[in-house]
Amino acid sequence: MSRVGKLPITIPKGVDVSLDEPLLTIKGPKGTLARRMPGDVEVHLEQGAVLIRRKDESNKSRSLHGLVRALVNNMVHGVSEGFVISLEIQGTGYRADAQNNVLNLSLGYSHPIQFVLPEGIKGAVDRNTIRLEGIDKELLGQTAARIRALRPAEPYKGKGIRYAGEHIHRKVGKTGSKK
């Protein structure tokens, strides 16, 4: 039995869960999320909780048990409270600016980069910090990873984009030649 999968997911007030096999729809104050459930697990709605159970003991259903529970839990958390990821920009001349759903990034290249945020993700810039908000944790994490990939922090001077609180392993540079 999966230690994660067997735990019930409590549904907070203001969140509505509906199951139309195989589509699970969760509505809350922040928005609506829907996801197709795999056929190897069963979703049960019981008095203020969602339970995920395996159909059989096959390797596939055992591996999906905890995954599906975590995905549904993230959906419930997203529509009730939402998720936030912060990115930090470090480097001389590196700047960011947010206009509507477009991030204008100046990252030391010969041209500015215009990054269009996907629907459902909001971005704000405060000095050298990019704050991304959304209800879909998967889409939010993928968007943050794509922004970070534009100029990842390099190990010598630490310039680039990093997650807030991320530790960059620093390296020492070359030493001068000995004559």
Swiss-Prot record:
Quaternary structure and partners: Part of the 50S ribosomal subunit.
Family (UniProt): Belongs to the universal ribosomal protein uL6 family.
Organism, as annotated: Syntrophobacter fumaroxidans (strain DSM 10017 / MPOB)
Protein name listed in UniProt: Large ribosomal subunit protein uL6
Assigned GO CC terms: cytosolic large ribosomal subunit
Keyword annotations: Ribonucleoprotein, Ribosomal protein, RNA-binding, rRNA-binding
Annotated GO biological process: cytoplasmic translation
Function comment: This protein binds to the 23S rRNA, and is important in its secondary structure. It is located near the subunit interface in the base of the L7/L12 stalk, and near the tRNA binding site of the peptidyltransferase center.
Family matches, as InterPro entries: Ribosomal_uL6-like (IPR000702), Ribosomal_uL6-like_a/b-dom_sf (IPR036789), Ribosomal_uL6_a/b-dom (IPR020040), Ribosomal_uL6_bac-type (IPR019906)
Statement: the UniProt record of this protein carries the keyword Zinc: no
Example GO molecular function: structural constituent of ribosome
A Pfam family recorded for this sequence: Ribosomal_L6
Entry keyword S-adenosyl-L-methionine: no
